[in-house]
Amino acid sequence: MSNLNKRPDWIKVKAPNSAEYYNTKDLIKNLRLNTVCEEAACPNIGECWSKKHATVMILGSVCTRACRFCNVKTGRPDLLDPHEPQRLAEAVQKLNLKHVVITSVDRDDLDDGGATHFAECISEIRKSSPNTTIEILTPDFLRKEGAAEIIANAKPDVFNHNVETVPSLYKTIRPGARYYNSLSLLHNIKKLSPEIFTKSGMMVGLGEEISEVIQVMDDLREAKVDFLTIGQYLQPTKNHAEVAKYVTPEEFKYLERIARTKGFLMVSATPLTRSSYHADEDFQKLKENYQQRHCEEAWPA
């Protein structure tokens, strides 16, 4: 597998420099919050923060796993911060967010994998910003009995868990996870709370075959997933997995067309697509697509 050092023009972005970007950065810093935008070196940080969109990362900034694609620090995590849910709710209120995305590191050291902390964050936001819709992007809660029930009972508007890549690459790219456990988690959340929209994403350009990507689409639809995101893998550092291919915009359009035939309510497939990219706008489209598909049914409460 060759290392493709030069990124093509279609995935180059401008460096952030707007006043709104720095305002968002200062607020996040002052409230002592972590964001996946910074920790994972997201290429869309300038655009999102300029719009006051940020994906907050709870449960600390140190992950218990070492996935080969991820730039988040790995090691021994800190103790849980009991005041984090309140600070997060304060940030949501100050930013006047209509839609918030909350993610986390993996916390295999916790009995519930951090599920209760997610639920507490949702509860605090509901108290101070009842009109804000909440999307959570969680780890897989591997071997954490009862975690799915805790999350489902917390009733986020969107539950997102990424399968990340095709099953054949799990041992090298996502060694601490199990593909079918991820599918099971997505399916269980939908089964426990059908009104929650479910979402999952994957990267391409890691050496997967097109046929494998299509099989993942089928598996996700079998798990009743509503929204699929597909984006280009970008190597964070030389210590991470190398890029096997830069997938062209035309190839992404092809994948999107195939995914739409599978029955997803929403599909986003572009080189710069990330799980939380345009999450606010996409949630509105998701609701509209649901209503169009179920025009004779009542909107779920």
UniProtKB/Swiss-Prot annotation:
* Reactions catalysed, as given in the entry: [[Fe-S] cluster scaffold protein carrying a second [4Fe-4S](2+) cluster] + N(6)-octanoyl-L-lysyl-[protein] + 2 oxidized [2Fe-2S]-[ferredoxin] + 2 S-adenosyl-L-methionine + 4 H(+) = [[Fe-S] cluster scaffold protein] + N(6)-[(R)-dihydrolipoyl]-L-lysyl-[protein] + 4 Fe(3+) + 2 hydrogen sulfide + 2 5'-deoxyadenosine + 2 L-methionine + 2 reduced [2Fe-2S]-[ferredoxin]
The entry's cellular-component GO terms read: cytoplasm
Residue ranges constituting the Radical SAM core domain according to the UniProt record: 49-265
**Hydrolase keyword on record:** no
Cofactor binding description? Binds 2 [4Fe-4S] clusters per subunit. One cluster is coordinated with 3 cysteines and an exchangeable S-adenosyl-L-methionine.
Q: Show the HAMAP family listed in the entry.
A: Lipoyl_synth (MF_00206)
Question: What protein am I looking at?
Answer: Lipoyl synthase
Name of the encoding gene: lipA
